[in-house]
Amino acid sequence: MYSIEVRTHSALHVVKGAVVKVLGSEAKWTYSTYVKGNKGVLIVKFDRKPSDEEIREIERLANEKVKENAPIKIYELPREEAEKMFGEDMYDLFPVPEDVRILKVVVIEDWNVNACNKEHTKTTGEIGPIKIRKVRFRKSKGLLEIHFELLELENPS
């Protein structure tokens, strides 16, 4: 069984994939993330507040991906090789220091690719249900904050 922080961190990747599916590639750049216990915040560069319908769809798609129990693959690769395989989309707005030569790249197939050195669950099903609690658009900075929490796992093993 994974710690709640590992599950919540893994949920960031699932939520991010849903955000990009619903809002488009304009929302692909992560500005910041935050995890504490079962609560997480994903902050992306974006130019507007999503509609209530879009927010519901992000939550629905994220939970669909959790139910799918998709594998979360981790590749540990030389930086140059990772950049050839995954391109700039694996990066966030906060840069990976230049002296880091080996990258861990988290891949949820056809959903999310991200250079990330944190621990993750092996599948999306191990994350548990995701509930979006608050969405805040900071117009002056062009940032969209998505606050979510993990609900209890239905069948913890």
Curated annotation (Swiss-Prot):
Residues that, per the record, bind Zn(2+): 9, 13, 116, 120
A Pfam cross-reference name: tRNA_SAD
Cellular location(s): Cytoplasm
Record's keyword terms, sorted: Cytoplasm, Metal-binding, Zinc
Record's cofactor remark: Binds 1 zinc ion per subunit; the homodimer seems not to bind zinc. The zinc is probably not catalytic. Another report suggests the zinc is catalytic.
GO cellular component, one term: cytoplasm
InterPro entries xref list: Alanyl-tRNA_Editing_Enzymes, Thr/Ala-tRNA-synth_IIc_edit, tRNA_SAD
Molecular function GO labels: aminoacyl-tRNA deacylase activity; aminoacyl-tRNA ligase activity; ATP binding; metal ion binding
GO BP annotation list: tRNA aminoacylation
Family the entry assigns: Belongs to the class-II aminoacyl-tRNA synthetase family. Editing domain AlaX-S subfamily.
Quaternary data: Monomer and homodimer; the dimer is less active in tRNA editing and does not have a zinc ion associated with it. Another report shows only a monomeric form.
Protein name: Alanyl-tRNA editing protein AlaX-S
The species this protein was found in: Pyrococcus horikoshii (strain ATCC 700860 / DSM 12428 / JCM 9974 / NBRC 100139 / OT-3)
